[in-house]
Amino acid sequence: MPKATAAEEEEFRAEVEERLINEEYKIWKKNTPFLYDLVITHALEWPSLTVQWLPDRAEPAGKDHSVQKMVLGTHTSDNEPNYLMLAQVQLPLDDAEADARHYDDDHAEIGGFGAASGKVQIVQQINHDGEVNRARYMPQNSFIIATKTVSAEVYVFDYSKHPSKPPLDGACNPDLRLKGHNSEGYGLSWSIFKEGHLLSGSDDAQICLWDIKANSKNKTLDALQIFKYHDGVVEDVAWHLRHEYLFGSVGDDHNLLIWDLRSPVSTKPVQSVAAHQGEVNCLAFNPFNEWVVATGSTDKTVKLFDLRKIDTSLHTFDCHKEEVFQVGWSPKNETILASCCLGRRLMVWDLSRIDQEQTPEDAEDGPPELLFIHGGHTSKISDFSWNPCEDWVIASVAEDNILQIWQMAENIYHDEDDVPTDDPAKAP
C-alpha cells in the first residue's frame, strides 16, 4: 500500500477533527435545554472579529421582548467590501413565555418567544477600509465608535451621521482618522472618566493616546502622547475603571505594565511584571475591586494580579487547552470572569469558589472556580461581550460567521446555598 503523502495526512487529520467538532456540537445542542436559559444563534454574512453590546435598552409597548443594539464588524474575502455594523437584538422579557426546554432546531435557539425569525437584524452598515479588527463605543456617547483597522490608522465614526445603507461607491468616510501608529493591532480602550480619551496598542510596540475632542485638521488627528516601552507587539490596552490616570498594557514580551499619566516620567510604566511564560494577549481590570486585574496568554492560562503586590499572581486558571485571546469581567457580579481561547471554548469563572472542597467526580470536570463552559461554537471565538443590561447574558462571535447570544441556566450560578429563605431558623 503506497505511503500517504504529507498533504494527504494533513487532509485526513482535518477531516477527523471536523468530524469530532461536529459530534461535540451535536452533543452540545442536545444538552442546551438543561444548560441554558437562552440561546440565540445567528449566522452573519461574514465573520466578525469584534462584538460589543451598546448600553441602551428599550421595551417596546405591548411586546414580550426588549430591544438592544450591538456593534459588529466584517472580515470579508475576495475583495468584498467591509463594514462597521450595528445590529438590533430582541431579548425575551423575564415574564415572557420562554421555555428553555423547547429547542427550535430550524432556528437553533432556546428560550424562544414570539416569532422565531428576526431576533437579530443588521440595521446599519458603514463602509470600512479592510476588516474591522476591533470596535468599541465611547462610554460618554455611544454613537461614537472607534475601530482598529488593517492599516496603522484608528478610525472614529459617529454612526448617527451615517446612512443605514452604505454608499455604493464603497468609500470609507470616518469622522476622524487617528495617526501615530506604524502598523495594525487590536488594543483599544476609551476612558470612562475623560470623554474622548482613547488608548490604542499595536504591532509596532507602541501605545498611542488621543483626545478626540481636540481640534483636528482635515479630519485627522495626531496622538497626544506615544508610549514605547514594550519589547514587541502591544496586544491589548485598558484604562483603569476607578483611577482616571491609570492604564494597563500587555504584549508579546510576556509583560503586564501599569502606567500613570501623573508620573514625572510618563514614558515609563510605574509597575512592570513578567506576567506569563508566553505572549500576553489581553487584560481586564475588575469593575468593582480597584486592585484586581486579569490577564490571558498564549501559555493557555488566565492569571489574576493584585496591583498592590504585582510581582506574584494571586491565582492561575489553567483549564484552557489553547491560547487565551480575550478576558472580560461581568459588569454585574464582582467575582465572575469569562475568558475564551483558540480552542472554541468560552469559560466562565467564579472567584468566590476558588479552593472550595470538591467531590472526586466534580474535580474531574475542572477546578471548583470553573463555573461554566460554553461549547456552542465550532470554530475559534474572536471576541465576546457581557450584556450591560441583562444579567448573565453574553454575546460571542466566531470565525465561522456565527454570532451567539446566550445565558447559562440560573441553577448553575445559584447554588442551593444562595437561595434566599424566609425561615429565620435556616438563615445563616
From Swiss-Prot:
InterPro entries per record: G-protein_beta_WD-40_rep, Histone-bd_RBBP4-like_N, WD40/YVTN_repeat-like_dom_sf, WD40_repeat_CS, WD40_repeat_dom_sf, WD40_rpt, WD_repeat_RBAP46/RBAP48/MSI1
WD repeats: 127-167, 180-220, 229-269, 275-315, 319-359, 376-416
UniProt GO BP: chromatin remodeling; DNA recombination; DNA repair; DNA replication; embryo development ending in seed dormancy; heterochromatin formation; heterochromatin organization; leaf development
The organism's place on the tree of life at top rank: Eukaryota
An example Gene Ontology CC term for this record: nucleus
Pfam families: CAF1C_H4-bd (PF12265), WD40 (PF00400)
One MF term in the entry's GO annotations: histone binding
Localization of this protein: Nucleus
Keywords for this protein: Chaperone, Chromatin regulator, DNA damage, DNA recombination, DNA repair, DNA replication, Nucleus, Repeat, Transcription, Transcription regulation, WD repeat
Claim: Transcription is one of the keywords in the record: yes
Xref: Gene3D superfamilies: YVTN repeat-like/Quinoprotein amine dehydrogenase (2.130.10.10)
PANTHER family noted in UniProt: WD40 REPEAT FAMILY
Function: Core histone-binding subunit that may target chromatin assembly factors, chromatin remodeling factors and histone deacetylases to their histone substrates in a manner that is regulated by nucleosomal DNA. Component of several complexes which regulate chromatin metabolism such as the chromatin assembly factor 1 (CAF-1) complex, which is required for chromatin assembly following DNA replication and DNA repair.
Quaternary state and interactors: Component of the chromatin assembly factor 1 (CAF-1) complex, composed of FSM (FAS1), FAS2 and MSI1.
Family: Belongs to the WD repeat RBAP46/RBAP48/MSI1 family.
Stated name of the protein: Histone-binding protein MSI1
Gene: MSI1
